[in-house]
Amino acid sequence: MSTETSVRIRGMLSIIGDLERIGDIYYQISKEIERKVEEKVWFTPEQRNNLTEMFSILEKSLDVMNHNLTLDYSAVSITKAKELENQLNAKRDTIKKQHFKDIEKGSYSIKSAGVYSNLFHSLEKIGDHIINVTEGLVGEV
């Protein structure tokens, strides 16, 4: 087996694992949202807006990933995918910093804080797996 073939196979196996993990995390998010509804946990407008922004960045990231999956390996560019991953990480960092301040101030309940934290961390993990898919395509595994 050639080195190039070996790199592609390793990339494909990595991609399969990352796509499966993305599905698993979305399932965990759905269970967290079910728990939020069942326990009547409410988010502040700021919490909702922050999560909406993260979902928006993820949607763009998924679009880039899906587009890259349709291309020949040699045509895949990782630039846009990394840019979106950096945006998502920056948003997570901003949310996390404010989240700790809000907990200290008692801006929302502990239940709300827990669900919110689980959601924004899960969304960031999805972003990690999305960038891993493109890295697998370009041989950066």
Regions found by a protein language model. Give the residues of each.
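Cytosolic, long alpha-helical scaffolding segments
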Residues: 1-141
